[in-house]
């Protein structure tokens, strides 16, 4: 099953896939050029000092033996200029794990809009950083304007158990939605 890992630039998508994958990940991080640095606002909190960016995809795999399921994790670029590639990567996905950062919540709306336009179900995982403001899940749900059915969790993309919990929230949601749509 194909799962998107999406979110804005510098949110932890590559880290999350590397953390979860049981195989060496495919990643297409490249050094940011002056042109890319001027196109992306690297002065925002959480982006200062960023020197690389994903220019195509990240890919990893996670087998869930108990469910006899293999999850193929596809990380999408976080910049609008990669939208055509993003759309190609999204083809065939059954859902998305959207990563968000409380320092830049407004940047998550564009990604959630793209996912909703494609008709994909998703969960939101707020990736925690040392300098991130701390909000309750209810406050985050309100700030992100999420439906009550949309799973919302916090995670640390560097921590396997934490990131796995976020992926479990998404897959449980997808299974429940599939059951709702059964005749």
Summary of predicted features, one role per range:
Residues 66-84:
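Switch II (G3) loop of P-loop NTPases
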Residues 99-149:
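Conserved C-terminal guanine-recognition region of P-loop GTPase G domains, centered on the G4
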Residues 4, 123-124, 153:
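A structural signal for isolated positions on well-ordered beta-strands in alpha/beta enzyme cores
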Residues 54, 63-66, 87-92, 114-119, ...:
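Conserved catalytic network of the ASCE P-loop NTPase/AAA+ motor domain
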Residues 129-183:
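Canonical P-loop GTPase G-domain recognition
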Residues 6, 64, 76-77, 103, ...:
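A short hydrophobic beta-strand->loop->alpha-helix junction that borders the nucleotide-binding pocket
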Residues 1-47, 62-65, 70-72:
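Conserved G1/Walker A P-loop phosphate-binding module
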């Amino acid at each position: 099953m194909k799962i998107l890992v999406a979110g804005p630039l510098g949110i932890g998508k590559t880290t999350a896939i590397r953390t979860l994958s049981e195989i060496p990940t495919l990643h297409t991080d490249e050094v940011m050029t002056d042109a890319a640095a001027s196109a992306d606002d690297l002065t925002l909190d959480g982006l200062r000092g960023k020197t690389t960016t994903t220019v195509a995809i990240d890919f990893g795999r996670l087998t869930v033996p108990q469910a006899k399921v293999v999850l193929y994790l596809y990380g999408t670029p976080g910049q609008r200029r990669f939208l055509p590639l993003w759309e190609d990567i999204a083809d065939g996905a059954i859902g998305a794990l959207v990563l968000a950062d409380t320092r830049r919540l407004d940047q998550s709306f564009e990604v959630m809009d793209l996912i909703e336009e494609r008709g994909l179900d998703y969960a939101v995982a707020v990736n925690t950083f040392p300098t991130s403001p701390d909000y309750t899940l209810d406050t985050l749900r309100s700030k992100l304007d999420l439906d009550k059915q949309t799973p919302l969790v916090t995670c640390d993309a560097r921590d396997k158990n934490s990131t796995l919990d976020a992926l479990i929230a998404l897959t449980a949601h997808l299974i429940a939605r599939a059951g709702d749509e059964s005749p």
